Amino acid sequence: MLFAEKNILSVSQLTGLVRNVLEDNFDHVWVEGEVSNLATPGSGHLYFTLKDASAQLRCVMFRASVRALKFKPSDGMGLIARGRLSVFDARGEYQLIVEYLEPKGIGALQLAFIQLKERLAKEGLFSDSHKKDIPRLPQRIGIVTSATGAAIHDILNVLNRRFANVQVLLRPVKVQGEGAAEEIAAAVNDLNRYGSIDVMIVGRGGGSLEDLWAFNEEIVARAIYRSSIPVISAVGHEIDFTISDFVADLRAPTPSAAAEMVIKSKAEISAELEALFHRLGMAVRRLLNEHWGELNGLVRAVKDPSMLLGHLAQRLDDLEGRSWRCIRQLLIRSADTNHFLHDRLRLQNPVLRLERCREQLLLVQSRIEKTMMHTVERAGQSLAFNAGKLQALSPLATMARGYSIVKKLPGGAVVTDRDQLAPGDSLDILLRKGRAICRVECTHD
């Protein structure tokens, strides 16, 4: 009878009662602590312990809630958790079913930004070696932004003011909210597949960190990194920085600034062209001055081509005389040799050997004569050719047709333009024969 009066419960019954008490009274609690024993099995759930100096609490965060996390928890991290208490029947342990997590002392989005930035930097996505140059004068600009936001209007206004002829291709997207990051990444990929785009602007106007968050998503960063088209990131205001700013080829503080940076104004382009024309003119004048200097050098070096021809003819005569002297000496030596051999052979009477030597001697003599004649003929042809070139290049041939060379005194600078002269200047005029000293009365066009 004693035991019959007692209400005896099974372990499962008692555990169920405890669970009901906990779930009814602690269905929405906030708790803070340090993470330990963090586990992430293949199921996608998150298991960890929150502890402080004197106690610990087992926690579980199911896969649906884990997917909403913007950052990655780790052991030793201080966290603030929101959830409900329950009991894990198999071990009889109470635990916190976590529905929301945020880092202690820093916002979840800010921590997620820092973690992703550090990871992508280690992978090299921000490396300067990967940055592409922005074209100096793009013909077609692709824009990824909202079709109804202020950013597209600011960009178009600036482009129309600076260079209205440029073509613009808008790929409209959501720039905030669920699915915005996926749309932005898809738009970047679409413009790369479309082709014929010289440069791309990806951005939006200002807003809170939450509003700009789509441009901090990894999927957007990797799409910009893979883009073969140079990308300018233009998100928010000058003080706003996003992951897309670091991975893009160029960061603009605002969408309007991106339009200013992507193309020069017509006035700037005109100024650059004018500077190029000025440099070209200076280069042409420098070349002309160099050639005039060469002409003056030729005039000083070659006073009269006939004199140079005379020297060359004299040298040719000298060579011809020396050649004939060599031939005569060879013939004399050959004759002496012939007489010597003849005397020796006459003593020995070798008729056949003498005849062969005589034939060889005549052959050598013929070859020597032909060689010398050919040498003299080639020297004469070279002389005639060089004489023709000198005659063609000589300013005297031009002066023989009535032209003259005018030099300004003193100094002897060659005059090619009336702007070099003034009334009263003295001139030295070189004629085909002789020269004349004149004075300038006036100049005309």
Swiss-Prot record:
GO terms for cellular component: cytoplasm; exodeoxyribonuclease VII complex. GO terms for molecular function: exodeoxyribonuclease VII activity; nucleic acid binding. InterPro entries: Exonuc_VII_L, Exonuc_VII_lsu_C, OB-fold_nuc-bd_dom. CDD domains: ExoVII_LU_OBF. GO terms for biological process: DNA catabolic process. It is found in: Cytoplasm. Keywords: Cytoplasm, Exonuclease, Hydrolase, Nuclease. It is an enzyme of class 3 (hydrolase). Its EC number is 3.1.11.6. Its main location: cytoplasm. It catalyses: Exonucleolytic cleavage in either 5'- to 3'- or 3'- to 5'-direction to yield nucleoside 5'-phosphates. The keyword Nuclease applies. It holds the Pfam family Exonuc_VII_L. Belongs to the XseA family. Bidirectionally degrades single-stranded DNA into large acid-insoluble oligonucleotides, which are then degraded further into small acid-soluble oligonucleotides. Heterooligomer composed of large and small subunits. This is Exodeoxyribonuclease 7 large subunit. It comes from Geotalea daltonii (strain DSM 22248 / JCM 15807 / FRC-32) (Geobacter daltonii).
